[in-house]
Amino acid sequence: MSVKWEKQEGNVGKLTFEIEQEKVKEGLDRAFVKVRKTLNVPGFRKGKVPRQIFNQRFGEEALYQDALDILLPEVYSAAIDEAGIDPVDTPQVNIESMEKGETWVLTAEVTVKPEVKLGDYKGLEVEKRETELTTEELEAELKQLQERQAELVVKEDAPAENGDTVILDFEGFKDGVAFEGGQAENHSLELGSGQFIPGFEEKLVGLKAGDEADIELTFPEEYHAEDLAGQPVVFKVKLHEIKTKEVPALDDELAKDIDEEVETLDELKEKISKRLQEAKEESVAQAKQEEVIAKAVENAEVDIPHAMVHHEADHLMNHFAQDLQAQGLTPELYYQFTGQTEEAMHAQMEKDAEKRVKMNLVLEAIAEAENIEPTEEAIDEEISTLAEKYGMEKDAVRAALGDMSELKSDLKIRKAIDVLLDSAVEK
């Protein structure tokens, strides 16, 4: 096969390749078998017309497009292999020559994977982070657990304070007219939680059960409902009940309520300390990894094709839709609730996608620069891990992974990250 690759502007180039007559004949034969099944020709049973009769009635050229559709995936794949290019998008294929009895000549406009110009990626300075759990961190966690065990107790003849939970009716009015979605009865609200627009909860502080009040507010300019954004409104409220948190003492009894596997507060503290220490070490390691990768990416230069960003954004959108589905929502409902559009969401996803694409390209380039290749032992170990995780046999995992290209790529990137981490300097 004759193949010619001409690099053009950016990451786009022109690939010229041929389909020789022997291959063309094979494609025409396969196309005829496919087309013949659908033909009704007088004098012949459906699907039984001879090739010679077909050519006489319709001409062999009638098979050219079907033959090309059959041959193109195979010959294009062979052409890009021979040219040594790595396409990142579906090509635009053009027919240059398709004459009877001659070699077919095709060209394709191909967007290829960009070259990465690496900057410094070894010996990068990163922040030195404390990994030891502090007394304050342990006490904060214990306080949270203590608060979760708190009971709400009705406050008698006392004003509402931040942290209290109030039961109230409210109705919102704009220009004296009640607006949609601005009313509720016997609504439970924790003051200071920030559930309502700024100012609403603050103006409930100091009221007592049975009090009624008019609360004058202005909706934020960025509020999702356009008819209310930046508009002055009045909420008529009536407090029915005020409840305050009654926090239990931090003692052995509470420790047993929090974790039935412990008998004393000291045992609970020890167990929580171990969990928090492990979590902190993991968090510090993750932060270090993110920082060193970000610096290596910042130091690199790469012209990213928009096609790669667009595909990655599509991938993120699909994941987003799956996450919504797991919560019992659809994208349409989400857009309705938030006032956002699918186009705006995709544009937002493209910003994240561009960062992810550049990061992966840079890490792949580092792996190549370091001549990183996963060993058979590492591949087998990863397959064992996946088999255990998904409850599958190793052979089944191997079959599902096919040529292992994705697994090998993942392992190479992990090793590239190790290169960054091992050489990083904490300061």
From Swiss-Prot:
Localization in the cell: Cytoplasm
Documented EC number(s): 5.2.1.8
GO cellular component, one term: cytoplasm
UniProt xrefs under NCBIfam families: tig
Family the entry assigns: Belongs to the FKBP-type PPIase family. Tig subfamily.
Known role: Involved in protein export. Acts as a chaperone by maintaining the newly synthesized protein in an open conformation. Functions as a peptidyl-prolyl cis-trans isomerase.
Name the record gives this protein: Trigger factor
Organism: Listeria monocytogenes serotype 4a (strain HCC23)
Primary gene name: tig
